Every structure is written in C-alpha cells, then in structure tokens.
Amino acid sequence: MNALSKVRVYELSKELGISSKDLISLLKDEFSIEVKNHMSVVEEEDALLIKEFYGESKEENTEENIEEKYGDLQEAQIKVVKKNRKNKVKKNDDENDAQEEIVIEMEDTITVKELSDRLKKTYAEVIKELMMMGVMAAVNQEIDFEAAEKLGEKFEAIVVQREVDVLEESVEQYIEEEEEEGTVKRPPVVTVMGHVDHGKTSLLDAIRKEEVAASEAGGITQHIGAYTITINGEKITFLDTPGHEAFTSMRARGAQITDIVILVVAADDGIMPQTEEAINHCKAANVPMVVAINKMDRAGANPDKVKQQLAEKGLVAEDWGGDTITVPVSAHTKEGIDTLLEMVLLTAEMQELKSNPNRKAKGTVVDAKLDKGRGPVASLIVQNGTLNSGDSIIVGTTYGRIRAMFDDKGRKINSAGPSIPAEILGLSEVPSAGDRFYVVKDEKTAREMAEKRKEKTRSEYLATSKVSLEDLYSQIKEGKIKELNIIVKADVQGTIEAIRQSLEKLSTDEVKVRVIHGGVGAITETDVILANASSAVIIGFNVRPDSNAIVSAEKENVEIKTYRVIYSAIEDIKKAMIGMLEPEYKEVIQGRAEVRMTYKISNVGTVAGCYVQSGKITRNSGVRIIRDGIVIFESELSSLKRFKDDAKEVAAGYECGIMVEKFNDIKEGDTIEAYTMETIKKHTL
C-alpha cells in the first residue's frame, strides 16, 4: 500500500472484528489517537501498529474483554448523566440552603416567552443563548425539550420533561427510570428529506426494491406512512414523509421520532430552499444526517459543488476534513445504495439506540385516516415497549382497544416491538398525525383520560359577522374583523397539521389566521353549523360537501372553498388579505348523477348507466368522480348518450349513459358531478 494512504475507523474495526465504538476507545486509551467518529481516518502506519498490537494480545483482548474494558465507559457516562440529573433534583440540604434552584416542568415543547418568564430572565438573554446554541427562535416560537434543557443548564436551572400531564397517576409508569439491564438494541428510524424533484421518492423506491414492485404489481400500495427493510440481517425503519416546503410541520414531527436523516441533494441541482429547511430541522432536533448526493448518473452531476454548498451551511463533508457523511448515489442505476444503507447502520451503531421491549408500549402516530369498511385506522411507530393486539390505548384525545394490527406489508400481526411500524384498528375516532400513544391498563381508563383531554383542549367559538375571502380585505380595513377562522377538511389526516401551520403562518398584525377545526372526510352539515357559529370559511382538500352541507351553506351564507393543491388555498388567502383577490373564473355546478350500473365494452372502456339526480349533465362540461365524499378523479366526458343516441344534455329525472375521458374504474354508487368554469368580471378588493 502507498505510504500516504489512510484507513477509516469503521473499515479497521471490521478487520479487527470489533465495533467502531470500542475501537475509538482503544485508540484513545492505548495509542492516544483522538478520532471524532467511525468515518474518521487513521494513518496506515498507525493502523498496522494497532493490528499488530491487537494480534499479539488477542487472547487477553478478545471482543468481549474489550467491551468489558472500554464499553463500560459509555454505560458509566450514561449512569453519571442520570445520576447528575437525579442529583440536580435532590441536592444536599446545605446546597439548597445556599441557593434555591429553579425547577421547570414542561411537556414536549415550550415557548421562548414562557421559558424566559420561568427562568426569570429577559427575552433578549434567552434568545441570545439560543442563537449561541444554533437555535433560531422568536419570543412566541416553541423550542423542544433538548434545547430547553441545555438552556436551563446555562442559567443554572433544572428543566424536567413531563410526558403526560393528564391523569398522571394513571400513566406515571411511563416516566419511571428505565432499567438499564432491560434495554436492548433497536432498529434506527430514518426519515428521507430533500427538495422536491431531487429524487427522494425514487431513492425510497430503490431502497425498497422488490417490496415496492410486489405491492404495486397487485395494484395495492400500503399507505402506512412507514416501512421496515432488512439489510445484512439488521432492520431499518423508514418514515415516508412528504418533501414539500408546505409540509414543514410533518417533517418537524418526523424529526421528533427520527434517529437519522438521509438528506437527498441532486448532484446537478445542489442545495435548494426545501433542502435548507430540512437541514435547519435536523440541526434544531440534533438529528444526525447522512447526505445522499443523488442523480450521479446525470451528465451535469457535480458532487464537489454540492459539498461546497453543504460546507457553507455548516456541514463539512468527511473527505473535506469534516464529520458529515456524504455518499454519491443514483436511484436510477442503484449505484451507492448499499453503501448509503451501510453508513446509516454505522451511524446507528454510534448512537447506541436502545429500548425496553418488555414494558407497556408508547410511541407516535405517523398517519391516520377514516376507512369506510374498517373505521378509524392509525399508523403508529412503537418507540418503546411492545404493542400487542388487544391492548387498551390512549392516542391524543381518542382511545380504544386494538382489534387488529397489520405490518407495513398489510400482513396481520399480533405484536410490534420498538421502532416497528404498525397499522391498528379499534380507535373511537381518527387521531391526529403526531399524537403520542400510550398503553393503559383497561379501556375504561383510556376513555376517562381521553375525555379529560378533550375538556382541556375544547375551544370556545365566538359568533361574529359572516366572512368570505372576497370581502375579507375590506372587513379588515374597516376593523370589523381581527381573526379569520378556517375549517379544514381533507382526505387524509396526515396532511391536516401541515395545512394548519401553513395557513396560520399567514397571520399578520391586523388579522390572525386560525384553523379552528380539521377533520377527515366529506364536508358535512356539522362543519357548516360550526362555521356559522364561528364565522369561519370552510376549505376542502380533495373532498366535496355532501348535499345537506350545500343546502345548509346556502341558507346560512357560509362560504365553502374546495382545492386540489394546498398552495392554491394559501395564495387565495394571501391575496384576500392584501386586497388582491381577483377571481377570473367561477365554478358552476351543473348537476349530479348517480352511477347505478356499469358496462365494460371491449376496445372502448367502461360505460356508466346513470340517473341524473339534480340539475343537468351537458356534453361539454367538466366532471369529477366522487366516491364516499372524496374526489377520486377529474376529467371530461368522452361520451353522453340517451338510449343509443348521442345527447347534448340530459336533465334531472332521466337516465343516461356516460363515459369519462381516461377513466374506466367507475363503480356503482359513485357520484358524477358536472361543472363548468364561467368567466366573471374581474374584481379588485
């Protein structure tokens, strides 16, 4: 080998047959060689010396003995930290007499303002310290427990996390100190983040390989929000979260349950706004990153440019002398995928991820939805303990007893251990994505806890004058409105919180945008009643109002806006607030028809035998297919017939045959809604 060549710590540990952690301790204690992590390099001369030393003393320095000798260092550090935390709470009486310590109890997050007040420090002092820690937060923004704890140490205060503050006597089992001997190694939970179109989904698909191919071949893809793969006999759990800037809250939520982030950056595009946003989330949550420089098969690929941009953001690549792992990959050719996963496992090894599978389970909701046949369905990640079928659980403000449990491939299972995703049935309502869940002793306890939580979180809605987006700006200027209330309905629960935060970010000094309710499914009369009582605008994403809701909204003068894309709603509200809403087209619903029978004609497609319930269906109208209150397809009519003759229009009370352009999956019971876009006079507010 070349005299100047170097070897990485993890490669050397493989040769010696010991873990990277133990080798780092060995280097420090026996050779006084300081290395940062498993990706650091040592000189070839030193590596040969270590091999020689290890070879000579192999009998007395077996892996077990080395672990006994050096592995205890980490355990001792953990014990010291835990002991120190206990000692902070239980100081000697003499010390307490000398100085009274501040003890602050908090939940998962706390605002900078509240923490400043409880620390008895000015906002400026606290914000300055946060900036020194690399956390950028304004007075009213929330910070997590880890940041608050570090801040407490700076100001000589003790910050204690209170996991569950409702019926604490029922859940105190969850905040007991973990038994050290009860913990075992668990799989890492990984989130893939990156800018839109940088190949995040392609990379996930390449990692899943045959699992994806097998599920898609049958026409069914499990939307569980997480899945587990096995590589070299070790499991890795991936969170499948959206990659757009609007889904900030989802990624922030993911960072709370994520152990490692794979940051995808296109080699030909470099760092973009969503990439920078993802980097900031990881830094704030102190989650280690492995950077996947994707699209290396492209002609314009420039990994050095990406590394330069990463360095500008404080992430210096390990081959540039830093400690950020970068792996060139191609989701298209599969190049570098195995190396990437190996780096993930090595990073996980350095983190020493452990949990106790023998306790009652707790974890987080990844996604949830309302299934017509199965009722409320929740996808969970178990973070500690083992979740069993038949367990009684509380999830946010809902509760239930697990009737059935499925893995990420849709197979029925009886239990799920730490870091394993599972889909469960048996909850009373659809929970929110990001809700924490806990197993309790029985369903009665879970119900009581859920009811108490509902009482605590129930908001009071004040009835004021009606509001619409078109006249919002004038009402703001006249001082008639200080708050814009919005009700959000969507087809999947996982997007509700992301939509909520995106809309609430639009708040200004003159008007506060507030999402007062979010739910899954069609817009109902109940939503209209709530909107009427609280002067709210109803916004639907990929869902439609039912007939009762339409009648009630017209009667009560409640505005219902429906969208397919979140950004359209944000832009409309933005324009309304600054007086620039200029609608050019207005959607006019022409009629609705119920599908009563379907006919498949070879080489032609599916014909729907329909009965027109209201209005009329015209040949040139746009149509949307609605199934169980959710829009599943939008297109145009390719054929409209009355008996065997072509028809220009069919009125209410008559039957007709309909074919929809590029859509053959029409089913009995579907509703076909016909509409036209009418040009209206431009209106400046």
UniProtKB/Swiss-Prot annotation:
Organism, scientific name = Clostridium tetani (strain Massachusetts / E88)
> Can you say where in the cell this protein is located?
Cytoplasm
Where GTP is bound, by residue? 194-201, 240-244, 294-297
G1: region residues: 194-201
* Identification of the protein by name: Translation initiation factor IF-2
Q: Which PANTHER family match?
A: TR-TYPE G DOMAIN-CONTAINING PROTEIN, TRANSLATION INITIATION FACTOR IF-2-RELATED
> Source gene?
infB
Chain intervals for the UniProt region annotation (G2): 219-223
For this record, the Gene Ontology CC terms, alphabetical, are:
cytosol
**InterPro entries, per the entry:** EF-G-like_DII, EFTu-like_2, IF2_II, IF2_N, P-loop_NTPase, Small_GTP-bd, T_Tr_GTP-bd_dom, TF_IF2_bacterial-like
SUPFAM superfamilies recorded: Initiation factor IF2/eIF5b, domain 3 (SSF52156), P-loop containing nucleoside triphosphate hydrolases (SSF52540), Translation proteins (SSF50447)
- Which residue ranges are recorded for the region named G3? 240-243
Region annotation (G5) ranges = 330-332
UniProt keywords, alphabetically: Cytoplasm, GTP-binding, Initiation factor, Nucleotide-binding, Protein biosynthesis
Please list the residue ranges annotated as the tr-type G domain: 185-354
Sample GO molecular function, one term: translation initiation factor activity
Family per UniProt?
Belongs to the TRAFAC class translation factor GTPase superfamily. Classic translation factor GTPase family. IF-2 subfamily.
**Function of the molecule:** One of the essential components for the initiation of protein synthesis. Protects formylmethionyl-tRNA from spontaneous hydrolysis and promotes its binding to the 30S ribosomal subunits. Also involved in the hydrolysis of GTP during the formation of the 70S ribosomal complex.
Q: Region G4: what ranges?
A: 294-297
Keyword GTP-binding applies: yes
Q: Which Pfam families match?
A: EF-G_D2, GTP_EFTU, GTP_EFTU_D2, IF-2, IF2_N
